[in-house]
């Protein structure tokens, strides 16, 4: 335990919080260009072909972003918007692609949870 005199001379230092999404640089989303669109397999015990893409952001970072939903229209040179949010079973994937923004279309025939997949309300 430090004495009061020691604390007067050198106060306690605050812990520095480390960001989980450093490439966003404290922004809610960032724009970027796809450099590679591919599938990858998750960690054990899961099994699938997860759709991901490498993205070169406007601030110069190159990150891997997950493409959620069934089917997508992304290819190399597509301009997309990314947000934070990791994928637990894909190591190194710390960002999500925002569906329905810029070149990334919304999920076709989506009826529920539409706002998460960039789908407009259907006309009755």
Swiss-Prot record:
Sequence positions bearing 3-methylthioaspartic acid: 89
GO CC terms: small ribosomal subunit
CDD domains (UniProt xref): Ribosomal_S12 (cd03368)
Pfam families: Ribosom_S12_S23
Keywords per UniProt: Methylation, Ribonucleoprotein, Ribosomal protein, RNA-binding, rRNA-binding, tRNA-binding
Alphabetized InterPro entries for the sequence: NA-bd_OB-fold, Ribosomal_uS12, Ribosomal_uS12_bac
Function text: With S4 and S5 plays an important role in translational accuracy. Interacts with and stabilizes bases of the 16S rRNA that are involved in tRNA selection in the A site and with the mRNA backbone. Located at the interface of the 30S and 50S subunits, it traverses the body of the 30S subunit contacting proteins on the other side and probably holding the rRNA structure together. The combined cluster of proteins S8, S12 and S17 appears to hold together the shoulder and platform of the 30S subunit.
Subunit structure: Part of the 30S ribosomal subunit. Contacts proteins S8 and S17. May interact with IF1 in the 30S initiation complex.
Sequence similarity: Belongs to the universal ribosomal protein uS12 family.
Protein name in the entry: Small ribosomal subunit protein uS12
Organism, scientific name: Yersinia pestis (strain Pestoides F)
Phylogenetic classification of the source organism: Bacteria, Pseudomonadati, Pseudomonadota, Gammaproteobacteria, Enterobacterales
Gene: rpsL
């Amino acid at each position: 335990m430090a004495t009061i005199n020691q604390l007067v001379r050198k106060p306690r230092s605050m812990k520095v919080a480390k960001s989980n999404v450093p490439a966003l640089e404290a922004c809610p989303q960032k724009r970027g260009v796809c450099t590679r669109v591919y599938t990858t397999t998750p960690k054990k015990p899961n099994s699938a072909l997860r759709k991901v893409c490498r993205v070169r952001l406007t601030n110069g970072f190159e990150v891997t972003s997950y493409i959620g939903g069934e089917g997508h229209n992304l290819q190399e040179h597509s301009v997309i918007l990314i947000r934070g949010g990791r994928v637990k079973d894909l190591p190194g994937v710390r960002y999500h692609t925002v569906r329905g923004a810029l070149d990334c279309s919304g999920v076709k025939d989506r009826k529920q949870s539409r706002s998460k997949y960039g789908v407009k309300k259907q006309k009755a």
